[in-house]
Regions:
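Non-catalytic regulatory/accessory regions that flank a structured catalytic core
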Residues: 86-90
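Adenine nucleotide-associated cytosolic modules
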Residues: 1-4, 19, 23-37, 41-58, ...
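Acidic, glycine/polar-enriched metal-coordinating patches/loops
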Residues: 82
Length: 352
């Protein structure tokens, strides 16, 4: 592959690129570049490590006519990224030379159902099509998982996979208001399956009554575009983080304690959950069956997890990755703190 930043369409072999990024500002194009992830130019410039795992990542950047992609590719090259290329002439020239593009479109029913979010510039037809093509695995169908599942189903996430081995107990209902009293005693997965079918029968739902652990996490999460950690056990959170890091899948993780909640995204290039919490906290100390929890706080964090998952899939806005959001309902305050990879982390920086 040429070392120059710019590549002509006839010089591009898509199979040779680790990452392809589309920095076009519009989300309403009827076609997409093959294998490309849509990102905003501003987000790519400010957070390149979110999209390029290393300085050696072989990357192609595309836009409409090659100007925006050329500017950002040159800037990334100046910053030390050694194999970043821009498509000369952009997608317009790619199309003019008869190169393949991926058709994007919505059916009349889809356009009507998702009209209000498609109208958002950050979503558009392309973002909605990405949602419809996505596979999201939600681990946990309780107080955090239910609002995630509800909003992703309503938004049109094409394939929802939900993992939870538990049954519904009466004490669950104060933080799981979508479930009727009649569902007490039913499996959470079965109850959620009924709910999703009633809300959006057009998406695919896969429910597994299985407990995720370090031994099965990779096989259960493989194939996901996004994983949502909605569990209430630290052992499961570490297993989700470790497996997703190995698979290269981003994780939206949230947790609640009494009146407080927290939220972040664990990107494949770190920091991971072990960077945030190197020593596993006590399961008993943070068990809501012992400490208690207020229902709306759980719903708030779960809803925010759904928002971040949608942003990841559509490429909208700025990611919360690298920041830990802390919410305190009693004081009605929220703050965010910067988090980074730990040099001693065995997952992000394994010994050589």
């Amino acid at each position: 592959m040429p070392d120059a930043t710019g590549l002509q369409p006839n010089e591009v072999d898509l199979d040779l690129f680790d990452v392809i990024l589309d920095v076009r500002p519009s989300r309403d194009s009827a076609s997409a570049f093959p294998g490309a992830r849509h990102v905003t130019l501003d987000d790519l410039v400010k957070q390149p490590a979110r999209y390029l795992p290393s300085m050696q990542t072989t990357t192609l950047i595309v836009c409409d006519v090659g100007q925006r992609s050329g500017v950002v590719a040159a800037r990334l090259a100046d910053d030390g990224y050694r194999s970043v290329h821009s498509l000369i002439g952009g997608i317009d020239e790619w199309r003019a030379q008869g190169k393949p593009l991926v058709h994007i479109g919505l059916t009349e029913a889809e356009a009507g159902r998702y009209d209000r979010q498609v109208k958002l510039r950050e979503v558009g037809v392309r973002g909605q099509s990405a949602l419809l093509a996505s596979t999201v695995t939600v681990v946990g169908a309780g107080g955090l998982g239910l609002p995630v599942i509800a909003y992703l189903a309503a938004a049109g996430a094409g394939h929802l996979r939900v993992l939870d081995p538990d049954i519904i107990e009466l004490s669950n209902l104060h933080r799981q208001p979508l479930l009727p009293l009649a569902d007490v005693g039913s499996s959470k997965v079965a109850a959620v399956a009924r709910y999703v079918a009633s809300v959006n029968p057009d998406i695919t739902f896969t429910g597994l009554e299985v407990e995720l652990n370090a031994g099965n996490a990779e096989s259960l999460l493989d194939g996901s575009d996004v994983v949502v950690d909605a569990t209430d056990r630290f052992a499961a959170r570490y297993a989700i983080s470790d497996a997703s890091h190995a698979l290269g899948i981003p994780v939206v993780t949230g947790a609640v304690y009494r009146w407080e909640g927290q939220l972040t995204i664990l990107e494949p290039n770190g920091p991971c959950y072990r960077c945030l919490f190197p020593d596993q906290p006590s399961e008993i100390e943070f068990d809501c069956a012992i400490t208690g929890v207020i229902g709306p706080v759980v719903g708030t964090i779960g809803t925010m997890q759904a928002v971040e998952a949608i942003k990841l899939i559509t490429g909208a806005g700025s990611s919360i990755a690298g920041r830990l959001l802390l919410f305190d309902a009693l004081s009605a305050t929220s703050t965010s703190v910067r988090v980074s990879r730990r040099d001693s982390c065995s997952v992000c920086n394994p010994p050589t």
